[in-house]
Amino acid sequence: MGGNGSFKRGETLSAENRKFETVFMIDENTAILEQKDKRKGIKLPEESHTPGRIYAAFRKDGKDVKLIAVYNENGLKLYEIHTDDHRGLNPHYHPWKNGKPEEDKVYPLEMDMIKLLKKIRNFGK
């Protein structure tokens, strides 16, 4: 069994019982995920059992990245990048602490986050 309850088929199960599957690996540490139940909103797992993992999810129409989550060496989310507008910031990120989003905090992307977003947006081009 691999990261976040993943099995050989690439499935993951979060603590809230959302099921995910790996659609594509951009590199050995960056995975594009989809929820198996397409009726649900687009989300990413709260934890990863693979240290330093990066997960991304595309919009339902597949035209752009919606979310990117970066996890620490303990599998807890460090931050989540959103490409939707939030308080005039588009894109932006929300920091996480101890496995939970920091309440009401939103920031413009830092340079390393911008590079990561570009890498994921351009992976198939």
List PLM regions with ranges.
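Catalytic toxin/effector domains delivered as secreted proteins or via bacterial secretion systems
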Residues: 2-125
